[in-house]
Amino acid sequence: MIDTKTAIAVLGNVTLDIICNSVDDVPRHDSISFQEAAVTPGGCGSNTAIGLSREGEKVYLVACTGDDLSADLLHQTWEKIGIDTSFTKRFTDQGSGVSVGLVDSDFQPRFIHTAGANKYLRPESVQPEKLKEQGVGFFHVAGYFVLPGLLNAGFEQKLSLLQEKDIFVSLDVVTSPAMEKPEHLWPLLPFLNLFLCNLREAEILTGHGDPESASGVLHQKGATAVVIKLGSKGCWLSEKGLGKLIPAPLVNNVIDTTGAGDAFAAGLLAALRKGENLDEACRTGIYLASKTVQYLGAVNIS
């Protein structure tokens, strides 16, 4: 049985985000202007960890950065917010990940990205024994498909060891060309308590554009519980083949959807850690996501 009086560890990509709003077109040879910008920590791992810390959770971040000015800003922010980085490694010969997000007039971001030190995040970065010693009861993988070091054999063994220690394991993918060949994902599904993706990702992975059919394929592949994020429509929750739509409230002041999925994951995990069931946890995730889309950038660190 999972002990809910525990910490949460987040493994995932971390970047310095530069978000530009709004940019609808990028001519090849011309300069362009935009209205506003935000420079913040980013990446699925950092976003989710910050969201959890904002909810009052004890959070360990399992990540890799370079040893540069970008990393200094990231670490300073994490320390200020209260995230434990004892499982985060700095590499002196490598730059940190950086993402430039171009948010269009429909509030949708496009990213120019360099992975930097994120490529060094590998199965051996997961230390089940040490995580358990630190009181970790929940382990979340954020941005799986943009972590090339995890797209190989061996990661499922680490997830299995986490579950053997009664640690709740969840995994959230992120849109990436690597999704076109999902064979690395399938062996992981039986070792997850919860699998998350959005509808576009679900269609790429399963070939089905409706959440019920997509969930069915994911269950056949070994997933126990599936949450498919549906943006402004809420999410689809499927447990043991029984699915239902959990609607989202209307949000009038949408500015930028960057990081909404990570905010959803943070709210969901925080609620599960407090002992709520998956239905209740999804509603908490939707609430946090609805707040995130009302400001520029994935996180609000003010």
Regions found by a protein language model. Name each.
Residues 1-14, 77-90, 103-194, 199-245:
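Ribokinase/PfkB-type carbohydrate-kinase core domain
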Residues 2-9, 34, 161, 211-302:
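Conserved phosphate-binding/catalytic region of the ribokinase-like
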Residues 16, 20, 67, 175, ...:
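Short, glycine/acidic-enriched loop or turn micro-motifs at the edges of active sites
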Residues 16, 20, 54, 83, ...:
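Generic secondary-structure signature for well-ordered alpha-helical cores
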Residues 52, 198, 261:
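Short, conserved phosphate/pyrophosphate- and ester-handling motifs at nucleotide-, phospho-/glycolipid
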